[in-house]
Amino acid sequence: MDRIQKEASVEELNGIFSEAGSVVMAHYNGMTVAEMTELRAKLRELGGTFKVVRNRLAKIALQGKPGEGAADLFTGPVAIAYSEDFVAAPKVLVEYAKSNDKLVILGGFMEEDVFDAAGIDALSKMPSREELIATISARLMGQASQVAQRLMAPAQGLAGAIDVIREKADA
């Protein structure tokens, strides 16, 4: 890899580290091409990416960035998984690591917060952005319908009273 390619790689990593919701680092030693392809496909389904990186270039790209504390994790054969959704990459990697002991999660970062493997595991158990939005909107809609019912109750009671008076007048 010549200097120009290295500079381009550092620029690409700068963009990844700046724009990703979360970045997870993992050792992939011993994984077959088929296993890595399967992992990449699972990540792609959730908008994530799995990329093998050169440690020295990743450390250079992290200098002065919010996730700079995670630079120590770049030792040995390291790949990064990242996604815009801050829980997508951790969820897929933790799930995949349970079934494949060749993938070892080292840690990761989300903005300024650096996590070890246990932190990534905890992050993977959080609901995704879409799940949070669905939960919040369901709660808001439930409360809105309760308010509407309470506002309509007096009018419904008045309509019922008018019907009773009309029935008595007709009889």
Curated annotation (Swiss-Prot):
One of its GO terms (molecular function) is large ribosomal subunit rRNA binding. It holds the Pfam family Ribosomal_L10. PROSITE patterns: RIBOSOMAL_L10. The keyword Ribonucleoprotein applies. One of its GO terms (biological process) is translation. InterPro entries: Ribosomal_uL10, Ribosomal_uL10-like_sf, Ribosomal_uL10_bac, Ribosomal_uL10_bac_type, Ribosomal_uL10_CS_bac. GO terms for cellular component: large ribosomal subunit. The keyword Ribonucleoprotein applies. Keywords: Ribonucleoprotein, Ribosomal protein, RNA-binding, rRNA-binding. Belongs to the universal ribosomal protein uL10 family. Part of the ribosomal stalk of the 50S ribosomal subunit. The N-terminus interacts with L11 and the large rRNA to form the base of the stalk. The C-terminus forms an elongated spine to which L12 dimers bind in a sequential fashion forming a multimeric L10(L12)X complex. NCBIfam families: PRK00099.1-1. Forms part of the ribosomal stalk, playing a central role in the interaction of the ribosome with GTP-bound translation factors. This is Large ribosomal subunit protein uL10. It comes from Maricaulis maris (strain MCS10) (Caulobacter maris). The gene is rplJ.
